[in-house]
Amino acid sequence: MRSQKRGNNRPIPVVAAAFVVLLLAAATAGCTGTERQQDGRVVIAVTIPPEQEFVERVGGDHVRAILLVPQGADPHTYEPPPGVLADVAEAEMYAAVGSGIEFELAWKDKIAALNPGMLVVNCSRGVDLIATGEDGRAGTDPHTWTSPRNAKVMVENICEGLIEVDPENAGDYRRNADAYLEELDTLDANIGDLLAGSGVTTIMVDHSSWAYLTRDYGLTEIAIEDEGKEPSPQRLEHLITQAKEERIRVIFASPEHSTRSAEVIADEIGGSVVMVSPLEKDYLTNTRYVASAFAGSNRP
């Protein structure tokens, strides 16, 4: 499971010099991620807040999670400060989303170089990825965690990784994972019933963050952004027409992105903008809220 898959190492000069200093310091100090914390906890690096919840629910008191992309930041563009990178040198495991999220394409190999002994877990291993294409390049939708069915796969991968780095506590990790998986099963069933009975078939969103959730529960997602960019005037007109034809009354936007186009469309259709984030740490509560918002989006 020790992953050495290479990503897109495009240079990010703002922190490049600091990264080199940290890399040299880690090598000099012999940091390999194998030293346990003084309190006995296993240090686990994670990319996004939902993964932090997964790790903490499975790991319990045995782990300390280091969050690389903080709440409110955009993992497509975020650059970690040197202090966070220094913390990674203490980690025994990195729970990477593993789905092509831009932060990891830019930083995963650099993070692994800081800590060669660290186990890198692809949390999306086993997920049926959604293919995308930008500027003629094939890719995958990175937002795997937004569907509870995928979250269950990610929790299993995290559990396996924790057992590998800390076999002494394997029983606790398995029990914790099973308990959390039961909660995810309940969430999955509740969302399925909620959306099936809502009459909603299509949602419009500012950024294509919810394709896995909409796929799993029989909805269609229309994204306002065009290949990650604000829509052209022509596309905006098309989206307004489409929203009217689909009788869409709510445009969903995320706090990590601009709401300008969502507000324009909402004004034109006499609707409203509702904020939903795919990056809240409280995964169960947030996903339940998002599904409820989707289910009520066609009401006057």
Locate predicted features.
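Extracytoplasmic metal-acquisition and chelation regions
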Residues: 2, 30-300
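Secretory targeting signatures
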Residues: 1-35
